[in-house]
């Protein structure tokens, strides 16, 4: 948004016009409101971003464009941001502006052509042609590619045009006849870097990278697929790409190469290909269905010869599994898998899917040491060399004693297939890495909060190992927050610090954390000496506090956490690494960095808080200690002394060494093999059990409570001593596999007193473990307990919560607040990016003395399915519903639910549990027990883990799809040949669709599940990919395919039932009381007598209490109130009529007693009941509304009758409106096929019933009766219809005939003269309320039903087919 010159809008504001002719808005003064106006940068649908124009609200409205709601939302958002700026602090505004600037930089890249993928000559409307290029834009998916004018593209991006031309004319495309695919050449060592490697020879391989390249080439020549397992940071990506480029240039093997990499490293792989192998045509096969369709159409092969265009495909695991049928149809010269440790489970779908690919060579790349068992190592070896490592049992038998006798035999067998090297071994120029643990004391406020948290959770802690592990974890997390900073435990309002001077605010921040006090001294000294620093923390809110501190200290910094996305992240990294950058610090989230981040320009790493898993901290250190680093890397790990944090670090080091890493060295290469798992039952995210957590919580707690509470002096530290020790050089671990231990140089700094950590641990080991009663003093416990009781009593008398407070409680989804007592201490506050519950929740759940609160049960009490999270279970259940006989299609379910890495055995176990519980719940609800006697037994749901599952819905889905499994062949080859052998109704799609397409659709559903239309479209074997999901405007789309599939499934189920001799169960109907034709009550014959009607099918008109039976109300009545009002009005009418009405029976009553209601008549078929549906679907209602728009006046006349007309005229007018409305309905229904006519006739009459007190059945019956009488009048009157007297006489006769059709009418025959009739009607009208519109309408309704007036003559030729002769 901007303020621009008035009228400077439209095409003259595009970037290419401005570059050629200058900016017409130049010199504009935004403050001059008279000559300027608000303008908005508009992205036009179907046009690329280079065609964006600045528009004002007036120009947009003048063009009458669609999508104005987007502009309204944008303006609304700008107003909200403007209001927020007035309330927010300067730090928040600065951060927002930084993010906005980075976002604008990202948007600018949308104007750059990344790749031209096609060209065409488009015919112009006025004659001639226009040459165009199909352009893929930078940072945007292929789906956003657009056709652009060739002149414009050639002028702005001539290099991309040249690259496109060279790709189109290239002869270096894949061929199956390449000789080296069948016979590998003899190996020749490469002693110098080839000239073609590295763009313009500006990139050079290091010695160890040349060795790695030679090893890869040697393995390929020996026909050995291999695993490259170098440590992170040694350039595995570069070595791999250079290997492919060697095959391309030296062996003339042009592919195709399939590279499967994580999405997070996709950009890095693209960049490295451009730099190291520029001649390889690499296509990134990612994106949605539309993007992948465009790639297959324009980037995959030449249209003329079907030869492959590309040399290498970059894709992800997820896309590969979605399109595995398509990708598996090609023969790949080389399969490359990055992050290959994801293939460690040989029972996972990902493993099995990739293993089936036809590949000539396989290369696995992993930088993560294998972690758990020898079988995982065998799984990788079996993947690359299935014939060499065929049997796991044999492999295990050969090496079962390796742990005791040594790994020499195993090394000898693995040497040709695995290469693992570490930085300290191969990169001698890489400086040393020195790590120190700096123990710091807590400040006085931290000690106070730490004691509060322990005391407050006393009832949960005293349970010890009997308590909930989740409760212990929550308490540990709260204590870790307190160790970092007091503000994480009890947040203060921002204004309390914003109003302070800078020095006072910094001092207040420092008093809240002993770590921050040490960090302040350390950073000041590091900045003076020219160092650059990386600061890591797990907690996002801690990064916020550090950012505030750095800003107030005026230290320039960058920040990277999970909220900062890919392109913005790249810009922050580039800014920090830029030559001459003034950035001093880089704040990083420990887990958000991911692989591929290079911050080698920094030489100091500060780990503010340690991760549960030391492996994550090692990866954090590697951000600076990697190739390109020229200085010694100093690593400072800050640990709060005598706290849970100190014990966690020590235990995590020991446990990770015992459970995970055993790295063995052989010759000059490192080989990764593993001992069998120690059955500890822990995970990498939480490597501690209950005993560990209980001991961690007790560590240092007793001494903390014994400290002199009056000693509130804040600590002071000697920074010179810290820096002196940091200069000590660490030569690296001497023992193999000792990277995790690192032989830390431990420095302990205490502020009040000096204590040896080893002595403290020795003393603790000698003592018996103390109980929490001995650790927390009794007086402290009593004080906290009294405070909690007092707060509980206050809560009882608190007024209702304000609306904004409720909103705050609801903020963030279902995040749970702390229970009573949490607010005071703030230890239950969430927001650090940790997925935890409040510690007090665990306390409440563990406290047996308190009554159980209603609501969701605690997480610790919920069932947990081993190996699956609730989110994974939810996806599994959703996919489970899509398949017939789902336990036979577990591989397809795993792919659909994105559970490809789960073993099929675990998936089968989960499926069986789901199936068993569904059957159990349905059997329970089918057989009511004594306990459920007297109440409804409608429980149809059950819990699978923490996921609720509707058993009835699940069973219904399985029942719908069950016939598919019995009907279709079991093998895919037979299914592709299989054809439906019965006729189906036309599909009415915009493409040609026949029985063969229906057969392929069912085969696709069998294989990929109901609703997986994208996967079916992708599978070329079904040959319907070009017919379905073509574009948004053409059928069939997903909803049309869903309807067609449901129809076909019903058909095959019906056929199977007939084949098996099953008959469809029908609902029992009441026996008909008479044998008369079903049309008797709809179209009455003129000769019928009142007596006949009284005796046919009529039950006693009295109820059990002797009262008159009230007419039933249609199911379309929206509320019971309407029904009551109708009953009251009807009762008043009956009372007003007196004894004359007691014997009257209405035709609709008789229909309710066994005779069907309105019928649908056709010339060739028997009459069918007109089904009157319930409330219409909103979309159907809107369609009905549009169809009935031509008779809008007639509908209004029904809704608002003219009160000045007499009742006779009112009846006549109503019948005329009904005739007009019915004619319109018949016209609308004619457009539908016979199978849908009945449904739409019901829908439209139901729509009309909303304008009257009549229901749909009554309206349709009256309409058909009017048509019959009009037809009879026309036949009787002949050509004398124009005679007014004759018409009046016919009117008079019709009235008499209608009178004879009154049900059970015992009243005296009315007078034949109109004068007597009008006189009687006037007397009746005096008895009713003339101003009551509904009462008047009720009289009209009664007249219409009794047939006391004949409708006006109408031309009803269109309705002759519905009249029964």
UniProtKB/Swiss-Prot annotation:
Keywords on record: ATP-binding, Chromatin regulator, Chromosome, DNA-binding, Hydrolase, Nucleotide-binding, Nucleus, Repeat, Transcription, Transcription regulation
Regions of compositional bias (Low complexity) in chain numbering: 1287-1296
GO annotation (BP), single: nucleosome organization
Biased segments, Basic residues type: 1061-1072
Catalysis performed (reactions): ATP + H2O = ADP + phosphate + H(+)
Cell location: Nucleus; Chromosome
InterPro entries: CDH1_2_SANT_HL1 (IPR040793), CHD1-2/Hrp3_HTH (IPR056302), CHD1-like_C (IPR025260), Chromo-like_dom_sf (IPR016197), Chromo/chromo_shadow_dom (IPR000953), Chromo_domain (IPR023780), Chromodomain_CS (IPR023779), DNA/RNA_helicase_DEAH_CS (IPR002464)
Database matches in Pfam families: CDH1_2_SANT_HL1, CHD1-like_C, Chromo, Helicase_C, HTH_CHD1_Hrp3, SNF2-rel_dom
Enzyme Commission (EC) number: 3.6.4.-
Chromo domain residues: 16-86, 111-176
Binding sites annotated in the UniProt record for ATP: 230-237
Domain annotation Helicase ATP-binding: ranges: 217-387
GO MF annotation terms: ATP binding; ATP hydrolysis activity; ATP-dependent chromatin remodeler activity; chromatin binding; DNA binding; helicase activity; histone binding
The keyword Glycosyltransferase belongs to this UniProt entry's keyword annotation: no
SUPFAM superfamilies linked: Chromo domain-like (SSF54160), P-loop containing nucleoside triphosphate hydrolases (SSF52540)
Position of sequence motif DEAH box: 338-341
Domain Helicase C-terminal: 518-669
Basic and acidic residues: compositionally biased ranges: 1073-1082, 1090-1125, 1132-1141, 1271-1284, 1309-1335, 1354-1365
Family the UniProt entry places it in: Belongs to the SNF2/RAD54 helicase family.
Subunit structure: Component of the SAGA complex. Interacts with HMGA.
Domain notes: The 2 chromodomains are involved in the binding to the histone H3 methyllysine at position 4 (H3K4me3). The CHD1 helical C-terminal domain (CHCT) binds DNA and nucleosomes.
UniProt-recorded name of the protein: Chromodomain-helicase-DNA-binding protein 1
Source organism: Bombyx mori
């Amino acid at each position: 948004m901007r303020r621009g010159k008035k009228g400077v809008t439209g095409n003259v504001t595009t970037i290419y016009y401005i570059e050629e002719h200058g900016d017409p808005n130049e010199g504009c003064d935004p403050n001059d409101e008279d000559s300027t106006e608000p303008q908005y940068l508009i992205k036009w649908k179907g046009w690329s971003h280079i065609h964006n124009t600045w528009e004002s609200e007036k120009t947009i409205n003048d063009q009458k464009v669609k999508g104005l709601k987007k502009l309204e939302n944008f303006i609304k958002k700008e107003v909200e941001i403007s209001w927020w700026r007035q309330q927010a602090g300067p730090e928040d505004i600065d951060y927002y502006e930084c993010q906005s600037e980075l976002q604008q930089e990202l948007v600018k890249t949308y104007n750059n052509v990344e790749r031209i993928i096609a060209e065409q000559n488009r015919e112009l409307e006025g004659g001639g042609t226009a040459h165009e290029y199909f352009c893929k834009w930078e940072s945007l998916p292929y789906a956003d590619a657009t056709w652009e004018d060739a002149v414009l593209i050639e002028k702005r991006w001539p290099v991309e045009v040249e690259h496109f031309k060279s790709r189109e004319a290239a002869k270096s495309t894949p061929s199956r006849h390449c000789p080296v695919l069948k016979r590998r050449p003899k190996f020749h060592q490469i002693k110098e870097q080839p000239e073609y490697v590295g763009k313009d020879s500006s990139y050079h391989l290091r010695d160890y990278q040349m060795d790695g390249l030679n090893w890869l080439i040697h393995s390929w020549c020996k026909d050995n697929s291999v695993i490259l397992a170098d440590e992170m940071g040694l350039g595995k990506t570069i070595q791999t790409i250079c290997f492919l480029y060697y095959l391309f240039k030296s062996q003339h093997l042009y592919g195709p190469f399939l590279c499967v990499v994580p999405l997070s490293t996709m950009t890095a792989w693209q960049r490295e290909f451009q730099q190291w192998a520029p001649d390889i045509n690499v296509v990134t096969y990612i994106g949605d269905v539309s993007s992948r369709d465009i790639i297959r159409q324009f980037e995959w092969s030449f249209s003329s010869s079907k030869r492959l265009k590309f040399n290498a495909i970059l894709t992800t695991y997820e896309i590969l599994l979605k399109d595995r049928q398509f990708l598996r149809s090609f023969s790949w010269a080389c399969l490359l898998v990055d992050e290959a440790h994801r293939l460690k489970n040989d029972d996972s779908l990902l493993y099995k899917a990739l293993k089936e690919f036809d590949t000539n060579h396989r290369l696995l790349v992993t930088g993560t040491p294998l972690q758990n068992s020898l079988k995982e190592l065998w799984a990788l070896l079996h993947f690359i060399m299935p014939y060499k490592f065929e049997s796991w049992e044999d492999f295990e038998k050969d090496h079962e004693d390796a742990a005791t006798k040594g790994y020499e035999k195993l090394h000898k067998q693995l040497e040709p297939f695995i290469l693992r090297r570490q930085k300290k071994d191969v990169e001698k120029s890489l400086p040393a890495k020195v790590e120190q643990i700096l123990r710091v004391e807590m400040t006085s406020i931290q000690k106070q909060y730490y004691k509060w948290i322990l005391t407050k959770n006393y009832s949960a802690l005293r349970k010890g190992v009997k308590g909930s592990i989740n409760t212990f974890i929550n308490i540990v997390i709260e204590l870790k927050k307190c160790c970092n900073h007091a503000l994480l435990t009890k947040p203060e309002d921002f204004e309390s610090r914003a109003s302070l001077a800078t020095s006072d605010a910094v001092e207040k921040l420092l008093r809240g954390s002993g770590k921050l006090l040490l960090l302040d001294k350390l950073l000041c000294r590091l900045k003076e000496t020219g160092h650059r620093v990386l600061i890591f923390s797990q907690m996002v809110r801690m990064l916020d506090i550090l950012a505030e501190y750095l800003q107030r200290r005026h230290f320039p910094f960058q920040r990277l956490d999970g909220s900062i996305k890919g392109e913005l992240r790249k810009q922050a990294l580039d800014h920090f690494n830029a030559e001459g950058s003034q950035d001093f610090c880089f704040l990083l989230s420990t887990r958000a960095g991911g692989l591929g981040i290079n911050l080698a320009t920094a030489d100091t790493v500060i780990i503010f808080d340690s991760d549960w898993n030391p492996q994550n901290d090692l990866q954090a250190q590697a951000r600076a200690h990697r190739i390109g680093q020229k200085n010694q890397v100093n690593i400072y790990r800050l640990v709060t002394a005598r706290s849970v944090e100190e014990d966690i670090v020590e235990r995590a080091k020991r446990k990770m060494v015992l459970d995970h890493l055993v790295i063995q060295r052989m010759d000059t290469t490192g080989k990764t093999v593993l001992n069998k798992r120690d059955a500890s039952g822990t995970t990498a995210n939480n490597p501690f059990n209950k005993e560990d957590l209980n001991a961690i919580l007790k560590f240092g707690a007793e001494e903390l409570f014994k400290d002199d509470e009056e000693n509130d002096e804040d600590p002071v530290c000697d920074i010179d001593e810290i820096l002196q020790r940091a200069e000590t050089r660490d030569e690296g671990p001497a023992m193999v596999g000792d990277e995790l231990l690192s032989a830390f140089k431990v420095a302990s700094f205490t502020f009040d007193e000096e204590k040896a950590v080893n002595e403290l641990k020795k003393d603790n080991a000698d003592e018996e473990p103390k109980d929490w009663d001995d650790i927390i003093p009794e007086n402290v416990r009593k004080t906290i307990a009294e405070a909690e009781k007092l707060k509980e009593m206050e809560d009882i008398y608190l007024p209702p919560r304000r609306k904004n407070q409720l909103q705050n409680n609801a903020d963030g989804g279902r995040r749970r607040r702390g229970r009573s007592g949490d607010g005071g201490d703030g230890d239950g506050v969430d927001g650090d990016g940790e997925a935890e519950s409040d510690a007090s929740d665990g306390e409440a759940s563990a406290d047996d003395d308190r009554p159980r609160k209603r609501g969701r049960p605690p997480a610790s009490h919920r069932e947990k399915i081993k190996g699956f999270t609730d989110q994974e279970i939810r996806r599994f259940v959703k996919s489970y519903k899509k398949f017939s006989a789902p336990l036979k299609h577990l591989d397809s379910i795993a792919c659909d639910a994105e559970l490809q890495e789960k073993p099929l055995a675990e998936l089968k176990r989960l499926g069986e549990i789901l199936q068993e519980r569904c059957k159990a719940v349905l059997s329970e609800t089918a057989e009511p027990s004594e306990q459920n006697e007297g109440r409804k037994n409608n429980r149809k749901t059950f819990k699978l883990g923490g996921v609720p599952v509707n058993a009835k819905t699940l069973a219904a889905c399985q029942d719908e799809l069950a016939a598919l499994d019995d009907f279709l062949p079991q093998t895919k080859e037979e299914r592709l040949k299989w054809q439906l052998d019965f006729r189906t109704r036309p599909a009415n799609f915009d493409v040609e669709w026949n029985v063969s397409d229906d057969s392929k659709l069912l085969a696709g559903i069998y294989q990929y599940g109901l609703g997986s239309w994208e996967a079916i479209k992708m599978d070329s074997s079904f040959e319907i990919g070009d017919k379905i999901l073509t574009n948004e405007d053409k059928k069939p789309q997903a909803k049309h395919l869903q309807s067609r599939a449901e129809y076909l499934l019903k058909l095959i189920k019906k056929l199977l039932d007939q084949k098996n001799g099953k008959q469809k169960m029908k609902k029992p109907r009441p026996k008909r009381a008479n044998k008369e034709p079903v049309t008797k009550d709809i179209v009455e014959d003129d000769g019928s007598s009142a007596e006949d009607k009284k005796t046919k099918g009529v039950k006693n008109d009295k109820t059990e209490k002797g009262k008159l039976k009230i007419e039933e109300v249609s199911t379309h009545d929206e509320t019971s109130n309407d029904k009551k009002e109708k009953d009251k009005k009807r009762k008043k009418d009956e009372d007003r009529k007196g004894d004359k009405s007691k014997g009257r029976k209405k035709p609709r009553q008789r229909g309710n007693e066994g005779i069907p209601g309105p019928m649908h008549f056709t010339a060739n078929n028997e009459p069918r009941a007109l089904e009157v549906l319930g409330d219409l679907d909103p979309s159907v209602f809107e369609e009905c509304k549009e169809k009935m728009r031509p008779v809008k006046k007639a509908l209004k006349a029904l809704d608002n009758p003219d009160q000045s007309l007499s009742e006779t005229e009112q009846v006549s007018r109503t019948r005329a409106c009904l005739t007009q409305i019915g004619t319109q309905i018949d016209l609308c229904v004619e457009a539908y096929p016979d199978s849908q006519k009945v449904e739409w006739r019901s829908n439209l009459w139901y729509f009309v019933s909303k304008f009257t007190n009549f229901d749909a059945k009554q309206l349709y019956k009256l309409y058909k009766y009017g048509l019959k009488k009009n037809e009879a009048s026309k036949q009787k009157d002949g050509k004398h219809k124009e005679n007014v007297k004759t018409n009046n006489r016919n009117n008079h006769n019709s009235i008499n005939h209608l009178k004879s059709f009154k049900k059970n009418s015992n009243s005296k025959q009315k007078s034949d003269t109109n004068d007597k009739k009008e006189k009687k009607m006037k007397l009746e009208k005096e008895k009713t309320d003339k101003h009551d519109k509904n009462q008047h309408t009720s009289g009209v309704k009664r007249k219409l039903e009794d047939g006391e007036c004949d409708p006006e003559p109408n031309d009803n030729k269109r309705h002759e087919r519905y009249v029964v002769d």
